[in-house]
Amino acid sequence: MAAVAGAPGPGEGGESEQDSETIPGERRLGRLSCEPMEAELDSERRSLVRCEPCCGMEIDTQENAGPDIEQLGDSGAEQVYGIHTNSEFVSVSAVDYMGINQGQIAPENRKARSEQLPREPFLQRQPIPMILSEVTDSGIYTGLCLEEAKFSSNNGSEASLNYSECDNRSVGTTEGSVVTSGIDSLIPGSEVQVTLDHIIQDALVVSFCHGNRIFSGVLMDLSKRFGPHGIPVTVHPRREYKNKPVESIQEESKSFHEEPLVKSEENSPEDVTPIQQLENCKVQNLWTTKPPPLFHEGAPYPPPLFIRDTYNQSIPQPPPRKIKRPKKKIYREEPTSIMNAIKLRPRQVLCDKCKNNVVADKKEIRKVATDSYKTEEGKRRRHETVTTVNKKLKTDHKVNGKSQNESQKRTPITKVTNLAHGRGKVVKVPSQTSAAKTQMHTKEVLQNKNMDHVKAREVLKMAKEKAQKKQKVTTSSKNAHSKVHFTRRLQNSSSGTLPPRLRIKPQRYRNEENDSSLKPGLETLRSSKIGIKPQTRYSATRSAGETPSEIQSPSNGPEEISSEMQDTNVCVPPEEQDLQQTLGKRGSKSNITVYMTINQKKANSSSASVCSSDSTDDMKSSHSECSSTENFDFPPGSMHAPSSSSSSSASSKEEKKLSNSLKIKMFSKNVSKCVTPDGRTICVGDIVWAKIYGFPWWPARILAITVSRKDTGLLVRQEARISWFGSPTTSFLALSQLTPFLENFQSRFNKKRKGLYRKAITEAAKAAKQLTPEVRALLTQFET
């Protein structure tokens, strides 16, 4: 190992003096032999340069003539070293400079100084301080040991360099770090010098040269919670000991840390290998550091990738969440469907109409018992009163003369019956010779109630007495409220069979303001006579629901419905052979039956058009208004002429034929869809709201639709058979009592009701959603 002090080289004397003058403190370190490619650091540009091979110089001569390694400047921690040659300078990088083949270094220049390159912006790559260790000789490669150079120079021209022997022990550097021989000698926590290659956002790509090995890696910024580009980084928080004091924890960690050291001292130093030393160091580091807590408040939930990669480590977990369990709602339900069906039944079983029928039957039975008890006592008295009345009528006819007798022979009788809950009154209104007298007489008859009532009561009692002997009276009272019925009068032995009677019921919802439409007809009927008009044609236009207000009179005495139906055999004689038609006008509070005589010859289905409209409480369907013009012919004749048995038998046969011809047929048909009078189209399978008395609006499904019409095409009723949701029961309701389910949901739904009501609503909603227009069209494609 030869010192290079005083070895000038080519142009060394002048150059060294100039360098010493221009750059104060410059010191010659030594000569370095290298391969033909030589490197040097320019003192002025302060950058690494590559020296091209000298012209005309061979490799052998070039190997001996190596460049000079000099210290170009000393500025505190940053020291710059350069290689001086006479060749031209070419810029080189730090990697090229560090990658010089160390095998061609001359043996006398084994010891060299490690370079600390300056951190200047013009450098391509900024070096970072690192520690180099000596590499043992292997083949042509020579180990390099770096150490601090000691200088002793008094002037700038001569300099002496003292080198210490290179051995395997660690050498202290200027940075205060420790470097040992071999890669196994590297200890975690020591500082090394790396080279910065690339800067990528939050990551740094660095390289580290250790002897003939080059290591590279990525350094990530840990100031953020997770690494760059979504790569998470585990940062374990410090364990917080809440139960144990700090001193006891430190003593435990120290005692555990000392145990492996004692074991290592017991073993011989020759048996311990570097790998075992490294493993011991790792174990010591793991146990000396405090493990992270298993659970602490405020810890973020770890990403799932780290849970998979860290099975045996404690990971911070968030506090356990409270699991909300819904409370079970207990519904008190009946075990069987029978109880559900019973629950759906209304509290009031009978409607208003049925109640009236039942009450009327009960009252009628009671009155029949009381009347039958008094029948025997007043039998003679009643018979005598009837004979006296007949005698008075005969004497009146004789006094008045033949003209009056003929004029009164065929005068029609208008009988008005006022029915209210089984009680009624019969008023006989005979017609007069003039219209003015008829109007005055009508007022007088309505005012003289007592006299007319006594006569009518006697006639009714006598008729009831005869009827009880032959037939039961209760049969006729049950048919009093039938919808459209044809009844034959009860036969008497003396009077024979009366003509059939048609009872017509209007709708209840009509107002009674237009009740005066029948007034002119009734006045004309009363004023008809034989002398002036032999055949008076009576025309009356009637609308459904209109009730004559003049004829309505309060009932002064209770009478039975059945007796009122039977009293016509006394008022109208059978030999007149006239049809009687009952026009039953039912108002909102009372029933009024008007009897009018019709000519037998012209009273048929073609000459007299009959208008019938059915209205019941349970069937409130909206029908088209029934209005028609009816023509009645009233033949001249007298009143109450005596009859014979032959005429009564002949009239009974003729009346049977007429009754068959006057019967109005009614047809019913099941349809798949129907249009209501208000314009709505209802189909089979629709989900609707339905209402029953005593129940809320309930969802139902239409099973069938029945439309009833007369032979003339007049609409009578529109009825639907429905099944209730949540119940196995079915009902028959009018289409007017049904409303669409989805359209009227907000107005019909009751939020306060629960239980079966909610279940029925849920089922109906599901069924309504499934009922698409396509399904509805398929259901209504074919009519049944």
From Swiss-Prot:
Signal peptide (UniProt feature, chain positions) = none
The Gene Ontology biological process annotation of the record reads:
chromatin remodeling; eye development; head development; neural crest cell differentiation; neural crest cell migration
Region annotation (Disordered) ranges: 1-32, 244-272, 463-567, 605-654
**SMART domains under this entry?**
PWWP
The record ties this protein, via PROSITE patterns, to: PWWP
Q: Where is the composition biased (Polar residues)?
A: 536-556
Q: Can you give the residue ranges of the PWWP domain?
A: 684-744
Compositionally skewed regions (Low complexity) per UniProt: 605-614
Q: Pfam families, per this entry?
A: PWWP (PF00855)
Compartments, as annotated in UniProt: Nucleus
The UniProt keyword set, sorted, is: Nucleus, Transcription, Transcription regulation
**Alphabetized InterPro entries for the sequence:** PWWP_dom
Superkingdom assignment:
Eukaryota
Phenotype seen when the gene is deleted: Embryos exhibit lack of retinal tissue combined with a reduced head size. Defects in neural crest stem cell migration and differentiation seen.
Q: Which GO terms describe its molecular function?
A: chromatin binding; histone H3K36me3 reader activity
Biased region (Basic and acidic residues) positions are 244-266
One term under GO cellular component: nucleus
- What is the annotated role of this protein in its UniProt record? H2A.Z-specific chromatin binding protein which plays an important role in the neural crest cell differentiation and/or migration during early development and is essential for the development of the head and eye. Acts as an adapter between distinct nucleosome components (H3K36me3 or H2A.Z) and chromatin-modifying complexes, contributing to the regulation of the levels of histone acetylation at actively transcribed genes.
How is this protein named in the record?
A: PWWP domain-containing protein 2A
